[in-house]
Amino acid sequence: CQPSVEYRGFPRARLIFGLLLNPNKHQILNIKRHTMTVEVKTLEELRKLNLFELIKTVFDNALAKGDLVYQDAVDSQIVRDPLSKIDNEVKIVDGLSKRPNNRASEPGSKEKTISESKMEDMKKNNPFTNPEPELTVIDSLLGQYRVILNKYPNSKYHFLLVTKEFEKQDSLLNPIELQIIHTILDNLNKGEGKNEGGSRYFSFFNSGPESGYSQFHKHIQFMMMPEEIRPYQEDVVRNVNYFIPKEIVENRRPLFYKNASFKHYILKLKEYDSFETEEEEEDERDSLATLYMYLIKRSMNIFREYEDHVKLSYNFIMMADWMMIVPRRNAKFEDIWQNALGFMGMFFVKNEEMKEKVLKLGFSKILEECAFPLEEDEEHIVYNEYGY
């Protein structure tokens, strides 16, 4: 029995659907994207979709037609940070200098509210409300979301999950959004849509004025890890039991990478291979939401402790078996902007001058200044405001 994913405006919809579900078929590469719209109504349909082939098809077509601002980097370097022992990719990204921004306020601003006129301007200049059809991968996901390509991608097959209606980037992720993220990661990394190159996808959400975001419309991003880089978080969560939400406060503390220069918190996730009942699916959703809110509350303690004027800002990063949060106090250090990518070992810059500056300042210094410094007794720190 086939799921009820809908393809509109394309006469051979059922054939296409069969190809999307079958990762061994590559005829989908011949689809002309503008003749097809894709609707995914349930998480189960999303799990069974050959998502990577669909993303790849839309990306390759858009690139060939000039709808993307992208070219492969020719000067990418992998550099090990002598302090953190983390391997970092440093490269010049063509689209960064052309990428527009549509922020509610500039980093460092002490404005506490957004004027109505400013909000209206942002909505007018919002690229996600009516995305370009050539960049759209899934037109409707669970009725409330879209999956679209990043027009100025940092790497191949860089895409976004966006809300259909305008929502602020500073709003919290809700339980269904967390479950969609987790389902997409499962699909791309080990499910029907697993990409054949071996690279692994991660997701990231930049929230708050100092988080490094450029667009105020709510969006979560997905990118592949460079093949040469192993996420340090994998070593942190290896041989560790997953967190059980009800046991967090009593028995467990979040994990962290001890060689890092910046405060961050990592939680190991339970991996679900399949769901036999609706109750199991709800259990995953509730668990992800509880763990995410635990990280949010712990981050709020950081801002309270530092009595920082900055509104809550953070980078939330997730893979299939862990989630991490990095509280942020600065969006940039000496003109070097950082969003979540730096905390995954990816330093992407506009030009050679900025590349040399990154190498001169050092990865650990940049990340420490953009986040909060990791303390020597970090593993013994107890926060009392929320009981964590």
Give residue ranges: language-model regions.
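Generic beta-strand structural signal
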Residues: G143-Y145, Y157-H158, S199-S203, F216-I220
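Short N-terminal edge-element motif at the start of the domain
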Residues: Y157-F202
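N-terminal amphipathic/basic-hydrophobic helices that include classical n-h-c signal peptides
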Residues: C1-T35
